[in-house]
């Protein structure tokens, strides 16, 4: 555990019934005259963009829509959108979407000038300076991008996803309106929900875990383990969906305070090269990596603590070993229940790509150094072999 730690978060978070209405007041309070609205075609097609659009209209401000962002975008695709954004003349940003949309908007908020671009931030994220206020509206209960200082982009030439991290990208305002996730397709709800699960359990068992991250990681883990199945299975389970939305936010706060570990590190090549959805790649690796990590005594102890906090039913586990094993089995059960693939074979990943995966995965030292149990290239090889 770190001896020094800090937590920075958005200026204000609005949740509950009709939370979207707060956008109107935010725009007026900031004196914004023109709003850049980031979204994507899928959000528009699902009818989800109408709510924030109406709230922006009610403010009387002009607005400009930027919706040409592909799924799992490369840094070049994000730069193209940022270049369009620069022509809008906007003085405030509103982003409505999943992690990719929110990350693109966060990057835009620090790229108003021509001093540097996304590629330069990949090499030197510290140069990013806050330029515009930003409002983030998540349409999934998973990524936590609405609260983190991170922006994840694909780097095709490295066949990797890379995180750009700078606290100047933390949102000013977050809107958690459960109406945005009510009709989320089960497949997407499942993948993003398990992404949030990975955030919480990785942050709780990482080297940088601290009282701030523990607070949010444990509460998020409790909410997810006891609500994710019903939230995904039942379109009308609004109480459970709302809890998942809050849990995803807590997971993002945990990332901000500590950070993810080997699950995310080893998943980045799966998205970067094979375009496997981020939540799915994390789900495939979640139980294998946590089982590997549980051989470290401190991780095993923390998994037992998580069991004591999150297991509300009359389970019979009494020892640390039993509790840690139960937690890992619970992770596997959730992934199975949600019908998420558990092997790379289902995505056509050939066995001969193994060494390339190992090489790429070991490059993500930003996250691997946070893993309590050190991960060697041989360890990574065995973990990838397990999911082949």
Predicted feature descriptions by range:
Residues 1-66:
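An N-terminal, well-structured beta->alpha segment
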Residues 44-116, 230-241:
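N-terminal small/polar loop signature for handling phosphorylated ligands or for N-terminal nucleophile
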Residues 76-178:
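Glycine/threonine-rich beta-strand-loop-alpha-helix active-site module
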Residues 142, 249-282, 365-367:
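Glycine-rich phosphate/pyrophosphate-binding beta-alpha loops
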Residues 150-258, 372:
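Carboxylate- and glycine-rich phosphate/diphosphate-binding segment that chelates Mg2+/Mn2+
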Residues 273-353:
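Gly/Pro-rich interdomain helix-loop hinge
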Residues 350-388:
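Short, amphipathic C-terminal "tail helix"
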